[in-house]
């Protein structure tokens, strides 16, 4: 019954969507990347209760802010959530933080201690799931940022709205943009279903 109600909730009237700016996607499998995401999901679930009960000031503020933005329209939820997390979470690179080259921290750790671009993007995904966004509309997108004069490894959260239009939640700025609207070369995305080779949208 609950499953049926959930499906019904997401059955909205068809609205003309602009998919021309979406990334092109080719579904593949990368066992290493998918294992890392599976491990992150396991750790995130094990820390879920702490997010609801912790008195840490950043986590308590995050809970309160999530309540304030829930049930707003999709565009407003994305913009508010992106600004909240970017403003609250301190950037810390993995080598300084964990003494590892690359590590995906769980949401509790990221809120309490800060994190790098992957950690921040994954925290945004966990926050959207808390706001009842379906997990299959979110992807961790990895590539190279080129807007600062050189290619830098970077990751962001790629989200699809109910019409199937893709949006990127930036972390260097608070902007929520369509693919191709900032200088970023995508390589791959990963979600609960596997890995996706991502290509920039075709130009008309």
Language model feature labels by segment:
Residues 1-6:
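Bacterial N-terminal signal peptides
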Residues 9-204:
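A structural boundary/capping signal
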């Amino acid at each position: 019954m609950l499953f049926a109600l959930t499906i019904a909730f997401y059955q909205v009237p068809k609205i003309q969507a602009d998919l021309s700016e979406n990334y092109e996607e080719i579904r593949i499998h990368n066992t290493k990347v998918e294992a890392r995401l599976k491990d992150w999901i396991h750790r995130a679930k094990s820390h879920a209760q702490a997010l609801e009960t912790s008195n840490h000031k950043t986590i308590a503020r995050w809970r309160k802010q999530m309540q304030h933005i829930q049930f707003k329209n999709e565009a407003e939820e994305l913009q508010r959530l992106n600004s909240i997390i970017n403003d609250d979470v301190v950037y810390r690179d993995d080598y300084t933080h964990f003494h590892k080259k690359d590590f995906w921290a769980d949401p509790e750790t990221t809120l309490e201690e800060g994190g790098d671009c992957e950690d921040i993007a994954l925290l945004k995904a966990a926050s959207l799931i808390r706001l009842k966004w379906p997990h299959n509309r979110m992807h961790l997108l990895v590539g190279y940022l080129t807007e600062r004069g050189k290619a830098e490894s970077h990751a962001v959260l790629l989200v699809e709205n109910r019409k199937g239009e893709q949006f990127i939640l930036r972390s260097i700025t608070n902007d929520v943009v369509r693919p191709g609207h900032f200088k970023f070369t995508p390589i791959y995305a990963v979600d609960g279903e596997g890995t996706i080779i991502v290509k920039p949208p075709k130009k008309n």
